Amino acid sequence: MSAHSMLCERIAIAKELIKRAESLSRSRKGGIEGGAKLCSKLKAELKFLQKVEAGKVAIKESHLQSTNLTHLRAIVESAENLEEVVSVLHVFGYTDTFGEKQTLVVDVVANGGHTWVKAIGRKAEALHNIWLGRGQYGDKSIIEQAEDFLQASHQQPVQYSNPHIIFAFYNSVSSPMAEKLKEMGISVRGDIVAVNSLLDHPEELQPSESESDDEGPELLQVTRVDRENILASVAFPTEIKVDVCKRVNLDITTLITYVSALSYGGCHFIFKEKVLTEQAEQERKEQVLPQLEAFMKDKELFACESAVKDFQSILDTLGGPGERERAAMLIKRINVVPDQPSERALKLVASSKINSRSLTIFGTGDNLKAITMTANSGFVRAANNQGVKFSVFIHQPRALTESKEALATPLPKDCTTDSEH
């Protein structure tokens, strides 16, 4: 293929990938974190290729083969093949074995955060040679990168489980490398290829300094990897088993939302209080109770003493008879436990969003290794900003409104009907 044909092909690929990346970002409600970053990287690549086409930049033909497109394409294809993609090109912080702070870029975070994917576009020959110490100075082997992923994942639990790691190879991987990764507990996706016997002259295996990711024929003659001999083709696992956390900790906001008259059909009012009218409108658009019920199903329910005590106090002041009755039934289903906030929760610095009550409730859930259900997203964000990431299920808030209905204006029948369709 001539350099011009290759350039045209690369430009066409870049344009297609931009469309796919944009579509990917739109596929999830609220978008995919890092989606804009992925698109901008692809657009930068396209801009560079167009400059080459216009004659503004002169590059070697070999460099055309080794642009970032191969890696970016691998990221897009990985994201398209996985469920519940929450972010791409996500940067995680972790501490290495020497106690130094490091960062790690995870190409695709999927399955609601439970799966980390590294997408690899480099050819099996190059990867295998780096692993055997025949790479350029400073090249980090895939196995070394896998060790970094494992270390980082153990410091970033999702719902108290370490994320599952998949290395997705789009230009094959040698059988010994695939085996080593599996031994480490990392899943492999891609073609696993055979390795030929050792050559007689290992000194011939030293790569030249000008090698790109897409090696020329001279390297293929001396490499041990036989890409024609595919031993196995492994697809992404269709079902990645996740250890679902079966413990749920209920925050005061969730207890209130669960028993609120708004959640039981009392949302067809215009209340004196603007915030209640807004919540009623939200409820007519999207019912919150089915979401809570679905998440709580088949799980053990907990609440700390402080949460229950404050909930009862609010209920005694503002609750209507139906709300109190539902509250009594709900409390019977809950294991009420003493306040026992975790150590990391106690390290949080108080602020407008972080008060002692929230700290106690979320910290107790953390200590129980439970997912805290809450409408208090402000606390969750503030804690996250201080480096403490709690396992949470966030929902819309609903206040106690039954006692407010007498002074509220009922919505006309046609309004309530229209809003429900």
Curated annotation (Swiss-Prot):
InterPro entries recorded: DUF1308, DUF5614
Superkingdom field: Eukaryota
Family per similarity comment: Belongs to the UPF0415 family.
Name the record gives this protein: UPF0415 protein C7orf25 homolog
Native organism: Bos taurus
